[in-house]
Amino acid sequence: MADSNSGGKGGSGYGLGLSTRTQVTGYQFLARRTAMALTRWRVRMEIEPGRRQTLAVVASVSAALVICLGALLWSFINPSGQLNESPIIADRDSGALYVRVGDKLYPALNLASARLITGRPDNPHKVRSSQIAQQPHGPLVGIPGAPSEFAPTSPASSSWLVCDSVTSQSGAGAPASVTVTVIDGKPDLTGHHHVLNGSDAVVLRYENDTWVIRQGRRSRIDASNRAVLLPLGLTPENVNDARPMSRALFDSLPVGPELTVPKVPDAGKPAGFAGAPGPVGAVIVTPQISGPQQYSVVLADGVQTVTPVVAQILQNAGTPAGNAPVVVAPSSLAKMPVVNGLDLSAYPNGPLSVRDIRDNPATCWWWEKTGGEARARTEVISGPTIPVKASDTDKVVSLVKSDGSGREADRVFFGPEYANWIEATGNDPGSSTTESLWWLTSSGARFGVENSRDARAALGLTAQPSPAPWVALRLLAPGPTLSRADALVRHDTLPTDMSPAELVVPK
């Protein structure tokens, strides 16, 4: 048998190739059979107790290992928790919140209060209610109405809008209602939403005054002064059909010079420079070889270039030089001193392109500031609706204390790249002041935050807050101040909300 494998190298045998696998397994079988004959007095080999015992041990160890791994996984998914020294504790069954002070557990009104009391930004440690019941308890503590959600955002730019939506009531002569919406985040400028630029304008009414809104600000206009209305391209319909403006939008828009007949000092008196073509206040026109004619007005110490609109307004109001502008040759005009005594920044270069308020009942003041820039950018948006995507209109939150007065926000929307950790700043685009700190909730409420390192660290608000104009921030529903002193208060009962609103349950 050995001779049959002596010529093969690297075959299927063991060791030096002196035996085959079949020979080895046969030998092992004979050894097991001999052992069974000596111990069991049997040689039929129907069963092998030793192998069964080995398999049983392997199966038991495997089952125990699987059970242990399953228990470990379940402890991560649904931990039972231990009280230990955790400062903030939550009942795993009911969700009730507790804060540990000394050797007692105090029911906490909210997470903000619990964090301020402990001075740590910990999340609640969930334990069984039976463990909580074994501990000594104290009364209710914390700030009523404080938030329990803290996930600060850090957008690259801060964007805020104050929007008016005018809705006409049914019936002839019925007053129009104005809904104020505050948008925190980027507006949707698709569709028919239009940013006013150039000669674009919106005409709105506040109380008894009419205002022309353009270039990010508002300018008052006398609705009865046709000498001004006609050159500006404003029709009686534009003025008479002007829709109301809320106090919120009125305060947001910076005021510009009034659109009226420019007041020329010492009008009618002789000019004080040589070669004056007429008295102070006279309008002069200079023909040009190419391009439109150039208009100027005579002042006491020189001439000031004006737009055709301003020249027409002055001419309509009547000038000391008569009903027609004085024609001055370019060579003569070049010898006259040039001055800038009149502020004419509110007047456009040409007639205004007034947006039809019936087709565009929504008007928004937009404030945006990018991180690292010194100045904010302000613009006015006009459109058929507020600049929110149609798919997101159901996410607009209606505030409970909405009264339609226009002094507070009726609705709030958090758009793309919104900011909820805020520092208030001035309304001027160049304002660099940083005032109070605020935390905003998804329900549209604002909470003042104590401006101390300990309070900010306890609430987990250590990132740099985003700027927001106070004129928009103040429109949100105010909440209590988040400070440690206000959190360290015990209560037997809580005050009742004196101005609640009914929750309508769908049938």
What residue ranges belong to the model's regions?
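Short, surface-exposed polybasic-aromatic patches that bind anionic ligands, especially phosphate groups
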Residues: 1-507
